[in-house]
Amino acid sequence: MRRMRGKSILAVMLSFSMLGGVLSAGGEIKNASAEMATETPEFGTQIITEDMLNTTPDKDYKVDMSMQGDAKDGDYNKYFLDDDVQTVKINIDENNLMYMFQNASDKPQVMTNQVTIGDETIGYAGLKTKGSYTLENMPYGNSRFSLTLNFGKYIKKKKYGATQNFHGLSKVSFNNFYFDKSMLKEFCAWKVLSKMGIPTPQVGLAKIYINDKYYGVYFMVENMDSSILEQYKKVDKSEIGDYLVKPEYYRMEYNTAMDQFINAEGDFDLSEHLKKNENGDYEASEALHNAIGGLWEYDNDTLQDVAKMIPTVLKWQKKLNQLYNGTDFSGKKIDVNSDEYVKLLDQVIDVDEVVRYYATHSFLVQTDDMFTGEKNFAVYVDKNGKSMMLPWDYDLSMGCFYPTTASATANFKITQMYDPERNDFGYNEEEGYSQYPLFYVIYQNKSLMNKFKKYMKDCSKIAALGGTLSTGETIEPGYINSCIEKIQDKLQAAATMPLTSGGRYINASQPADMKKALPSIKKIYAMRSVGVVSQVDGINATVCGSGCDLSAVGNGQPDRFISMRGKMAIVDEKTGIFAVNTYLGGFAASLTATKLTQDSEQYKTIQSNVQLDAGCNAVEMYSLSAVGSPIDKYTVYVPTASKYKNTNLVLYNYKKDGSTEKVSTKKDDNVYYGEVSELGTLVLATTSKVENKTNTNTTVKKDQAVKGKTYTVKGVKYKVTANGTKRTVTLVKPTSKNKKSITIGKTVTIKGQSFQITAIAANAFAKNKKLKKAVIGASVKTIGAKVFYQAKKLKSLVVKSKKLTKVGKNALKGIQKKAVIKVPSSKLKKYKKLFKNKGQKKTVKIKK
């Protein structure tokens, strides 16, 4: 959480008044809370001292090994819910709790008795307050602090046989929504970050109970820890380097004074400047401390964590700064737009990941960042001296720090990640970025900035417009809107529950404020998506922010006046449909797009009256209406679902007078667009049949296989997953476990139709005690969890498929220890990674 600066003297005075502050006759601001604390404690009935705390776990406590895990397996992910609010119950000695509350600003660690998350209970986790601005500005007597749980703080390997974790999770935090009336700002931001393939923590929402008293809803987030990278890279903790920090010195410019520590071999020799004291802790010499700057947080614990990595990090920093200055590693000038530059840069940073990070960060308009002097990011440098960027702290995303209004946020320049009025950035973008090597090494290369823009468009697809991402993943339109709608009712119910005495939501009246914020947080994601696409694709329309109030979301401002002049875009947040037109002035404009269901009377009426070309079939209809008075034709943009990915669609406009206007239709990925004379009902039509269970033009004959049903063919059960233009099935399981050999073909014939076998269901051949050989056909793309679990005699597995993308957890656990897996030679390297750590013994071989 950032340390926020006051905007005016009045705001400061009001803030202190709200917090219990008083202004003395001499103008000195005093804290009434502190004075009151000398008479009676802010929390509890007496002052709690350290000697009154319970700090020792039961000596006979046993670590529940069934709850211990490796972060790489992601077993704890299921406790961070997508469509519900998790329940977290903390049982703690009352003295420990009051001590933590009474000393909240010092963030003391206290011991809990037990913590229950969902249906799992774990003993003796550490608990502490967290934050900076939130702690400094908590209203007097309010106990709704942000919190962190540390599962292994008191249960260490030396005493208890294992350093305790929660299914692989070491620490989890609970943020109190200080700047977020919607309670969904960070939740949505992390959805976009995760979909963009950036290493991100697990997140969710949680109801917190402490000693059976309800403290309300919190944002639940995995701590910035190696567990994030272990899961992202699918590796053991031992393979992750120790340098994962939120650096104090956010610019990361190399200090040439560090050259004094370089030895003849070109390495940094810190043996005389980084030594252990009598307590076994590392200490840095004054010379090293002065030269090194803020490469890590200014605390002793972090120094101990990163000490061994410092020489590697310094070498990384020097190389980064050489490229930033336009030279190679020998100091020779280099063309920053050359292939050689990118190759050298890829030795220093994970180029693709870093570009993705900055593109997503820019899309989210999170200007409370390194470019405004804050630390809300992390840097990871691996053991080989190559770095990644990890995002952090998005409670002020979507313009709620700067530029603060919906119109300004939606149209925020895609390469601007800063407030031009803060620090020394000024209004010269290139000059400003040139002081930040971490980004400037990307910014100064044209091809990388083109990739940056492509990834920003990917963010628009994720947030609202749908389509195929650069990774090949397909996203449905309205993704963020659907994420919100899945959880909003559960969230509202949790926010409605009365809080314990002394617990109050800060800067919000819940659940009223959350409910009020919902339309605006949905709209801002759709508006920003269109604003980015408008810039990247050269549409050059200004998105109208009408109907979106960022002050309702939290910490933003309403649009006081929206000038409807020039080329403007209006957008519907639910469908992602947007329209562009020219305006000469007038009131703010907005768009509403209502999808008509095929069984509605309106749909049936239009279907019977709309005049389509011969052979065209209507598949979807959207009734459009708008506020505003444009002077030209509308250009409408219609994002379509993935089921139309391989289908050519055309647009028709059913006008208010009952006539039909055929639209000259163009296509960009999944978005169809064209000009219409007025906004009526848009009809999407196709000349081919589309796999669509609600499409009346697609019928299934009685003698055909039915999607969703299971059929048995030659002793094997198959479930039909598609029976349209494409026909696919999942192999469920054989009817008998007595077969010694099984061959999964490329296709299977069901009711006279040929279906591709594209998947093998979980547990399909589990505990088959006679199976010795299995052949996986050429169409299989996914192998489910525990497919060959405890098939103890399985010694030969032949994979013919070159399309395999996923192998489930423990798919090979318990197969013969000397088993051989044969794969296509062209896929050997990829499939070795794919089959890695699927439960098999290390003696199992994978070869071509």
Question: What is the predicted role of each segment?
Answer:
Residues 722-724, 737-759, 769-782, 792-806, ...:
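Structural signature of tandem-repeat unit edges
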Residues 155-156, 176, 197-201, 213-359, ...:
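Internal "kinase-insert"/substrate-recognition segments embedded within catalytic cores
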Residues 113-176:
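Conserved oxyanion/phosphate-binding beta-strand-loop segments in alpha/beta enzyme cores
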Residues 671-692:
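C-terminal beta-strand-rich structural cap/linker in extracellular carbohydrate-active enzymes
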Residues 600-650, 655-656, 688-689:
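Proteolytic processing hotspots in large secreted/extracellular or virion-associated proteins
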Residues 44-57, 66, 96, 285-372, ...:
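Middle-to-C-terminal accessory/interaction subdomains
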Residues 20-38:
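Sec-dependent signal peptide cleavage junction
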